[in-house]
């Protein structure tokens, strides 16, 4: 039987953790560095940070958060959001991420998987799927 793993996924927007419903109406839920300490002390198996911000300033904040979190983290750290090229992957790995999550860009350019695999190894790639269910009622 496979071991069950606890892998919290933290959404970050403008450097803060957020929670939303159906990819909107986000509310602030706290500081990511504090949360990393808590999950580390509770022996989570891995932690995932996803940057859902769309601007360059937030991308730099996210890199800094990954850097700080990796120093406090006692488990593998996975980071993603806004990754569109090898340079983005390199920055995250250099900042302390063990793996990267490719989501939206994967549907636009599947070759990025092979590029990452060649440069960093297949062990550091996670494919993510954003799924939004729209219920259509028949009248």
Enumerate the language-model features and the residues they cover:
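Conserved anion-binding
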Residues: 12-24, 93, 97-139
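Catalytic domains of carbohydrate-active enzymes, especially glycoside hydrolases
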Residues: 35-50, 95
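Generic structural signal for hydrophobic
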Residues: 39-42, 69, 92, 116
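Glycine-rich, proline-tolerant flexible connector loops at the mouths of alpha/beta enzymes
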Residues: 46-64, 104
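Conserved beta-strand positions in the central sheet of alpha/beta enzyme cores
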Residues: 48-51, 78, 100-102, 126
